[in-house]
Amino acid sequence: MAPELIQIDLEPRKPAPKPSWLRAKAPMGENYHDLKKLARGMNLHTVCESAQCPNIGECWNHKTATFMLLGNLCTRRCGFCAVPKGRPEPIDFDEPRRVAEAVATLGLNFAVVTSVNRDDDNVGAAQVFAQTIEQIREQKPGCRVEVLIPDFQGNDESLRIVLAAKPEILNHNTETVPRLYRAVRSGARYERTLNLLRRAKEINPAQVTKTGVMVGLGETTEELLHVYRDLARQNVDILTIGQYLRPSKDHAPMTRYYTPEEFLFMKEEAMKMGFRHVESGPLVRSSYHAHEQANSTKQPLVTI
């Protein structure tokens, strides 16, 4: 019998003790410190640090990092996100070169690149993504690239600019169920997210697409399964499902911890819907095991 996922309201309450399956190792090790020093020295930002990712120690010690473009100040105030908010600096068009140099210095064969939202200049933001892909391929031939993009406020030109650079994987996160969008995803729209994922396939049917959903914000089983079906209808290839962890008391409250068995149930249900790969677990984040996810789709390297 499938485990019952219980709906709990969004009222703040004293959090339950963190279960053992959510206790990640403290970040340490030579590779961790080397990557941190490199990012500082090249004036680069990583979402691993800005979003307080629990997997930072594991990933950085394997020389895997998700570089964050367009500065470290986001123009939106999403209730779940730990990335700082504010008025950003002008777009830095030298950033793609520095990210590519870091990728080459680290000897990465798979790079993940994301960004803050830049609602002040969606086309400029897309150009930085495209230039970063191109610079990485120039400075580290053979390196595959995954991009985790914002919704560009539905701007089709921006999406086309990124797709023209032919990333191996195009990721745009759904984050939560439609009912919780207003409280959790400031400035975003559920239908806009579905449209972006659908348009990516319409523009380039061969493009591998990916999206992620958090659980623990007050959603129900039925709502989650409805979202997975919606995403499958957009021909999304890869789905990630992970536990929401509240960054601070100023962020959206977490309603409960999901068990490993519940994550397995969600993976099994989603796989029945036609996804090529589903990564589902308490510590799963968008870029966690991204290289392995890419391999599972059997997607050959895109050449340009």
UniProtKB/Swiss-Prot annotation:
The keyword S-adenosyl-L-methionine applies. InterPro entries: Aldolase_TIM, Elp3/MiaA/NifB-like_rSAM, LIAS_N, Lipoyl_synth, rSAM. It catalyses: [[Fe-S] cluster scaffold protein carrying a second [4Fe-4S](2+) cluster] + N(6)-octanoyl-L-lysyl-[protein] + 2 oxidized [2Fe-2S]-[ferredoxin] + 2 S-adenosyl-L-methionine + 4 H(+) = [[Fe-S] cluster scaffold protein] + N(6)-[(R)-dihydrolipoyl]-L-lysyl-[protein] + 4 Fe(3+) + 2 hydrogen sulfide + 2 5'-deoxyadenosine + 2 L-methionine + 2 reduced [2Fe-2S]-[ferredoxin]. It holds the Pfam family Radical_SAM. [4Fe-4S] cluster 1 binds at residues 48, 53, 59, 287. [4Fe-4S] cluster 2 binds at residues 74, 78, 81. Its cofactor is [4Fe-4S] cluster. Its EC number is 2.8.1.8. Pathway: Protein modification; protein lipoylation via endogenous pathway; protein N(6)-(lipoyl)lysine from octanoyl-[acyl-carrier-protein]: step 2/2. Residues 1-21 are annotated as: Disordered. Residues 60-276 form the Radical SAM core domain. Signal peptide: none annotated. The keyword Metal-binding applies. Binds 2 [4Fe-4S] clusters per subunit. One cluster is coordinated with 3 cysteines and an exchangeable S-adenosyl-L-methionine. One of its GO terms (molecular function) is 4 iron, 4 sulfur cluster binding. It comes from the Bacteria. Keywords: 4Fe-4S, Cytoplasm, Iron, Iron-sulfur, Metal-binding, S-adenosyl-L-methionine, Transferase. It is an enzyme of class 2 (transferase). GO terms for cellular component: cytoplasm. PROSITE patterns: RADICAL_SAM. It is found in: Cytoplasm. Belongs to the radical SAM superfamily. Lipoyl synthase family. This is Lipoyl synthase. It comes from Koribacter versatilis (strain Ellin345). The gene is lipA.
